[in-house]
Amino acid sequence: MSYKKVFLKPGKEESLKRFHPWVFSGAIARVEGEPEEGEVVDVYTSKKEFIACGHFQIGSIAVRVLSFRQEPIDHAFWVRRLQVAKDLRCALGVLGNPQNNTYRLVHGEGDNLPGLIIDVYDHTAVMQAHSAGMHLDRMVVAEALEEVMGDVIQHIYYKSETTLPFKADLLATENGFLKGGSPENVAMENGLKFHVDWLKGQKTGFFVDQRENRALLERYAKGRNVLNMFCYTGGFSFYAMRGGANLVHSVDSSAKAIDLTNENVSLNFPGDTRHQAFAEDAFKFLDRMGDQYDLIILDPPAFAKHRDALRNALRGYTKLNAKAFEKRRPGGILFTFSCSQVVNKQDFRNAVFTAAAQSGRSVRILHQLTQPGDHPVNIYHPEGEYLKGLVLYVE
């Protein structure tokens, strides 16, 4: 199949030779054929040598690379890529595990499918497009997904209203089922059940990327008073309860998130009085709280989504962690995270270091955390390592 062509400026092919999956607009010398948003194009060097093919889009990232081979991007291509993604999840033990039917099947660049996210909750796949190309290819992707996953996937929900690039010249799209409909919205993670709000919830309905970190927290919870800030649907809260916490308090500014947290706690621990939830701004809650907590989780939403917001984001992380350090009991544990892609590991550690120094407390790092294996990082795309976390012992 012949695709329209993008030609690079001299020397701008070097990142593609290192298999980085993005072509920036500033690297392009000319475009032949006037490709539309989301159309597949072939990319050539200034010497007219083929180097990659991918989805074309107006914006800073002009091409998201699908292949470094000259091949048709057809049904067979999608089947091959999804099969590789499935094989990895089988190797990780997250697919086919009776104690866990929640996992990420496709993680964008990490699975060589930039712009595509697919999370699985029991028999429902929630598909999210972050590029015009993946949006336009959603039906062929859904067909390939059915072929690869078989009866494992009985429902496919497409949720991209808020993730598609606003500059893309796309017709308005609505969230909705591409296959099936009205499935049960209860899934399981490490033997714990939870409701998934894929219709209106954040991301695909649940923060799948914290599965292993929640399991680690469970090991530290016994006999402790736990505070789960920015709790969303309460994932860390009910792991802490299963781990034997004395009490667990969950805080989120969203009343709907608090309702979901209470539902999930009741689903796993009906009648358990150890848990209490608060619909309140996190900073205000930290200002008024006492020193009764000896295990605190700080897992805020992304403080920065663009590099021009980085400085303010780092100040926000410092302020948030400083408040937690100030009121921590001696011998307390802090789980603190950043999910901002533009905040790298060293930036985040420096922000937490500053907060610790301001508090005057003795602080030691017990664990350095990241995303789980079903959120793989393409070694040629280090930007994909977005989740950073530290487990700290505070004297």
Sequence positions of predicted segments:
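Non-catalytic substrate-recognition/targeting regions of SAM-dependent transferases
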Residues: 106-119, 135-207, 385
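S-adenosyl-L-methionine
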Residues: 256-297
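Non-catalytic accessory regions of SAM-dependent methyltransferases
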Residues: 1-122
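Conserved SAM-binding motif I beta-strand of class I
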Residues: 247-252
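C-terminal catalytic and target-recognition region of SAM-dependent MTase-like enzymes
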Residues: 333-395
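Mobile active-site "lid"/loop adjacent to the S-adenosyl-L-methionine
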Residues: 293-323
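Conserved SAM-binding loop of SAM-dependent methyltransferases across substrates and taxa
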Residues: 233-246
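Conserved class I S-adenosyl-L-methionine
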Residues: 223-232
